[in-house]
């Protein structure tokens, strides 16, 4: 019985899951020419094009970019249509998946869960249809899942302004393509028009559905979180050598057309901005957003952590000091750091997860401790107070929907109700997501005269847009320059 967001159904040894992970790695870039070579070769556009043409992953990038064309069919919609022709009742499981996705944060972990559960649903229900080789034969790419579930949201209610919705999706695609191809410029998207957009009154989630989602699931995806990012620069301060070897051995044994993968970047194509970078103790993948999507226990801990920082004392301390003091107090109270000492490999600690502290306020175990150790004070500060994507994720997530289910005898009724009500409400407006996506792209682009002017113009309108939608964060001008 499909329940959605179920970690027990997605073990890290799942072949479907690892296949998706494999095709979310990029092929390594060719080595940079030596200084001697570059000194004798004049830098001009012809040489740059020639170097690009010789790139080992050019064909891969071209193929990945196909899904980022607005006039190309949605492959996920095509698969859904094929499944419905075979069995119309399949839509009930699909509707539950979409409903859970609707209240999930936009994180790599969320996308991995959604795409894996989708492929499991179609393979288990339709064994007579050959769905093998979807990635191998370039029938789908991970960007098909990006667009279908998180960008265009093909499953959601019909909007009144179809053309604006189409243009927003078009702009999202252009942003991803420019970062994927590592272009020097970001698409020039003017967001000033959104400042005068009439805000629709927010609808609330159906209370009837809320009443049905009362049974907590024993779901937790932290082991998967460590697995997917082990051996990458996302965990550059917490080594997982054995876990990394296990993962690389598993995915390299899969039948594929990939001869090599960019190990340190990890499955970066799962991220909203498919570009792996670290800057001032932050990474382009926020581990706290990932943790928020892992379980209700972890969501509640982050909620407690944020409130503790806000309530730390009545003096006018800087937020970074509040963060540091609160984390130090939590570590001192839980004592987990005394058990999980400095190790050269934390893989065993992940699988054992034998140390835990719990009281009336929060639960903290080895998994959360190691994530906090990796993110550090700056990472926590950025997540709670600086990054608009993190705040949008905090506004979007609904733990009662994501991590709860219903009694086994009622789950089919729940799926039918979700399907026929067709209420997939967007918590954060689509144009706000677009502006945030553009902001994240500006964080990773190399500054030049042209895009510096573009960023300055954008930030004026972006700051006003955030205020209009009640995003209370540190000045984005600081964040865009110092963090990723």
UniProtKB/Swiss-Prot annotation:
Cross-referenced InterPro entries: Herpes_env (IPR002597)
The keyword Manganese is assigned to this record: no
Any one GO molecular-function label of the UniProt entry: zinc ion binding
Protein's cellular compartments: Host cytoplasm; Host nucleus
Superkingdom of this protein's organism: Viruses
A GO CC term attached to the entry: viral envelope
Pfam families in UniProt: Herpes_env (PF01673)
Residues at which Zn(2+) 2 binds: 286, 289, 383, 390
Binding-site list for Zn(2+) 1: 74, 77, 148, 154
Record region (Zinc finger 1): 74-154
Region (Zinc finger 2) residue spans: 286-390
Keyword field: Host cytoplasm, Host nucleus, Metal-binding, Zinc, Zinc-finger
Role played: Plays a role in efficient localization of neo-synthesized capsids to nuclear replication compartments, thereby controlling cleavage and packaging of virus genomic DNA.
Similarity section: Belongs to the herpesviridae UL32 protein family.
Protein's recorded name: Packaging protein UL32
Organism: Human herpesvirus 6A (strain Uganda-1102) (HHV-6 variant A)
């Amino acid at each position: 019985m499909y329940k959605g967001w179920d970690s027990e159904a997605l073990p890290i040894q799942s072949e479907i899951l690892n296949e998706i992970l494999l095709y979310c790695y990029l092929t390594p870039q060719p080595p940079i020419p030596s200084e001697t070579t570059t000194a004798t070769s004049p830098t001009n556009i012809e040489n740059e094009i020639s170097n690009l043409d010789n790139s080992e992953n050019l064909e891969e990038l071209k193929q990945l970019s196909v899904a980022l064309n607005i006039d190309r069919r949605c492959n996920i919609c095509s698969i859904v249509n094929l499944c419905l022709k075979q069995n119309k009742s399949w839509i009930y499981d699909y509707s539950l998946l979409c409903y859970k996705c609707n209240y999930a944060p936009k994180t790599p972990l969320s996308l991995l869960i959604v795409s894996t559960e989708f492929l499991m649903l179609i393979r288990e229900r339709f064994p007579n249809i050959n769905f093998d080789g979807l990635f191998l034969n370039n029938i789908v790419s991970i960007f098909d899942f990006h667009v279908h579930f998180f960008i265009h949201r093909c499953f959601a209610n019909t909007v009144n302004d179809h053309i604006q919705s189409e243009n927003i999706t078009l702009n999202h695609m252009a942003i991803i393509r420019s970062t994927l191809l590592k272009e020097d410029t970001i698409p020039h998207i003017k967001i000033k028009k959104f400042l005068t957009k009439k805000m629709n009154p927010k609808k609330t989630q159906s209370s009837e559905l809320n009443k049905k989602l009362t049974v907590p699931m024993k779901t937790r995806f932290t082991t998967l979180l460590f697995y997917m990012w082990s051996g990458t620069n996302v965990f550059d301060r917490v080594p997982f050598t054995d876990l990394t070897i296990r993962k690389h051995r598993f995915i390299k044994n899969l039948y594929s057309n990939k001869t090599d993968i960019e190990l340190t970047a990890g499955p970066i194509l799962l991220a909203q901005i498919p570009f792996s970078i670290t800057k001032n103790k932050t990474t382009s993948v926020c581990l706290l957003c990932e943790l928020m999507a892992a379980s209700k226990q972890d969501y509640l801990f982050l909620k407690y952590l944020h409130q503790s920082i806000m309530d730390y004392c009545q003096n006018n301390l800087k937020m970074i000091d509040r963060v540091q003091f609160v984390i130090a107090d939590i570590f001192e109270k839980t004592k987990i750091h005394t058990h999980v000492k400095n190790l050269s490999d934390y893989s065993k600690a992940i699988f054992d997860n034998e140390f835990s502290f719990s009281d009336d306020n929060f639960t903290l175990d080895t998994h959360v401790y190691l994530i906090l150790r990796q993110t550090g004070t700056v990472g926590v500060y950025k997540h709670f107070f600086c990054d608009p994507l993190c705040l949008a994720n905090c506004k979007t997530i609904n733990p009662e929907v994501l991590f709860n289910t219903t009694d086994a005898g009622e789950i089919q009724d729940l799926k039918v109700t979700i399907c026929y009500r067709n209420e997939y409400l967007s918590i954060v407006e689509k144009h706000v997501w677009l502006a945030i996506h553009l902001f994240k792209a500006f964080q990773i682009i190399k500054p030049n005269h042209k895009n510096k002017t573009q960023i300055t113009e954008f930030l004026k309108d972006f700051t006003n847009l955030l205020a209009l939608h009640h995003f209370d964060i540190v000045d984005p001008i600081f964040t865009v320059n110092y963090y990723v």
